[in-house]
């Protein structure tokens, strides 16, 4: 298997303290990828949404919002939150879903990929984004907006990954790929420290120790 262990980050979060702020304080182009799984995106999420990655009010990848079911993807970004309510299907439960967000202020394109397929795109990107402060995995605005489930393979790029690149690398990627700013596999299996595999030094420490879950990905066909 390519992935043998993942982190359950229920009621947990990971502040992102960038080693080199200059790499993230004016990103005109960004791709964010994550592999996530939840047994229930909606239960107990009454006034909360589920945060994957980003900075509140600037650029934030999350699941759910007040205007939509709690299982629908949404990205907060310059140009307005996207996609709109009920434009895309909700995420499935009890299975890993690969989510990729591409924001490109040079072309204007903002896209959402689910399991390697582009399911939404518009042309509303306007300006560079700044991730240098108040950036988190699993936290935004207030502590209730944690991610209810497992996370793996979180990657932040300063390039627009293509549909083909996104579809072909859900479970692993070369840590020295061009444009890869941070790569957190969340496969440590012990403790609360998450290593940035790029060598760029953006290691994370959880607010608490995550629950480590054994998995087998990709799942072998029975």
What are these regions (language model features)?
Residues 28-30, 49, 57, 95, ...:
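Residues that flank catalytic or metal-binding motifs in active/ligand-binding sites
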Residues 79-82, 121-122, 131-153, 161-173:
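Extracellular glycan-interaction patches encoded by glycine-rich segments
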Residues 1-11, 33-42, 56-126, 141-142, ...:
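Extracellular glycan-interaction surfaces
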Residues 10, 19, 54, 100, ...:
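Residue-level detector of conserved, well-ordered beta-strand and adjacent loop positions
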Residues 30-40, 97, 145-171, 181-190:
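Extracellular, beta-strand-rich glycan-interacting domains
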Residues 20-32, 88-97, 127-129, 143-150, ...:
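Extracellular/lumenal carbohydrate-interaction signature centered on repeated Trp-anchored short motifs
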Residues 1-12, 167-222:
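Extracytoplasmic low-complexity segments
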Residues 33, 43-59, 137-138, 167-171, ...:
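Aromatic-rich beta-strand patches that line glycan-recognition/binding surfaces
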């Amino acid at each position: 298997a390519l992935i043998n262990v993942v982190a359950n980050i229920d009621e947990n979060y990971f502040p992102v303290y960038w080693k080199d702020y200059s790499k993230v304080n004016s990103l005109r182009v960004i791709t964010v990828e994550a592999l996530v799984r939840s047994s229930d995106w909606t239960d107990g999420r009454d006034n909360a949404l589920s945060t994957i990655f980003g900075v509140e009010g600037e650029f934030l990848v999350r699941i759910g919002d007040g205007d939509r079911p709690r299982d629908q993807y949404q990205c907060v970004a310059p140009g307005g939150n996207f996609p709109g309510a009920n434009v895309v299907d909700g995420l499935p439960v009890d299975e890993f879903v690969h989510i990729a967000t591409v924001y490109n202020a040079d072309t204007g394109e903002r896209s959402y990929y689910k399991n390697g397929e582009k399911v939404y795109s518009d042309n509303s990107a306007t300006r560079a984004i700044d991730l240098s402060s108040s950036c988190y995995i699993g936290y935004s605005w207030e502590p209730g907006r944690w991610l209810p489930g497992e996370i793996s393979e979180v990657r932040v790029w300063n390039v627009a990954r293509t549909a083909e690149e996104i579809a072909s690398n859900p479970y692993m990627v070369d840590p020295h790929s061009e444009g890869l700013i941070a790569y957190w596999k969340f496969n440590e299996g012990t403790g609360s420290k998450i290593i940035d595999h790029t060598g760029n030094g953006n290691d994370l420490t959880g607010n608490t120790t995550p629950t480590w879950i054994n998995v087998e990905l990709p799942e072998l066909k029975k």
